[in-house]
């Protein structure tokens, strides 16, 4: 099994969240709308998702820098981001290392169509619940940030197997919890989560799926 990383957590912890307000705001309706992954999820009211997910130059810079340094990415390295959304992390990767060969996939046509001009040519629509068309170890690095928990357990297992197969190195981030308070906060906040695991359950899933890459968990403290 790979190493426990902390690339995304500092950004996650910097955001303030009102957990009870989210839970009490007609949450089932909001969940159904969020799972369309269309305008409301990305750029609509906060009750449906991001509440306006716009490109902020430099926001993803620390994560991009950590990925480049940790995985020794250089000109010609091939990177795949599974569930890339609007591709903002890939944008920062290309700013830092223009010679990278990046590919981003997502299920959301809206998200992909609202990527920056720099990365839009490198993005394709793909459902992570299905098969991955790429060959074994085709990418130097395969990443997936805060997407895999949106898959049901059997879909998640398949996705992790595919990520393992097509990458030489791997890194995934998922929502998780370490105690009852964090579990409650996650249940209040999550709109699209299909698989809610604690730390040990995630390690079990990694072993079950044969995933040996690095990982990170974000917690709702």
Briefly describe each language-model feature range.
Residues 147:
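Hydrophobic adenine-recognition pocket in adenosine-nucleotide-binding enzymes
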Residues 1-71, 78-135, 151-165, 169-221:
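Class I (Rossmann-like) S-adenosyl-L-methionine-dependent methyltransferase catalytic domain
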Residues 143:
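A conserved beta-strand element that flanks and buttresses the S-adenosyl-L-methionine
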């Amino acid at each position: 099994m790979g190493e426990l990383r902390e690339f995304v957590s500092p950004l996650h912890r910097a955001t303030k969240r009102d957990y009870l307000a989210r839970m009490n705001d007609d949450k089932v309706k909001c969940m159904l709308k969020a799972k369309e992954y269309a305008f409301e999820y990305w750029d609509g009211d906060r009750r449906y998702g991001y509440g306006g997910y716009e490109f902020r130059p430099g926001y993803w810079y620390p994560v991009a820098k950590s990925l480049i340094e940790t995985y020794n990415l250089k000109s010609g390295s091939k990177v795949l981001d599974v569930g890339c959304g609007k591709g903002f992390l890939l944008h920062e990767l290309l700013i830092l290392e223009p010679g990278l060969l990046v590919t981003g996939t997502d299920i959301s046509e809206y998200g992909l169509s609202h990527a920056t001009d720099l990365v839009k040519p490198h993005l394709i629509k793909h459902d992570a619940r299905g098969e991955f068309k790429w060959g074994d170890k085709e990418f130097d690095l395969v990443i997936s940030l805060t997407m895999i928990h949106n898959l049901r357990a059997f879909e998640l297992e398949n996705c992790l197997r595919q990520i393992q197969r097509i990458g030489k190195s791997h890194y995934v981030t998922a929502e998780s919890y370490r105690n009852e308070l964090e579990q409650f906060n996650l249940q209040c906040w999550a709109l699209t989560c299909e698989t809610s695991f604690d730390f040990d359950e995630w390690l079990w899933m990694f072993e079950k799926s044969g995933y040996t890459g690095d990982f990170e968990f974000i917690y709702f403290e």
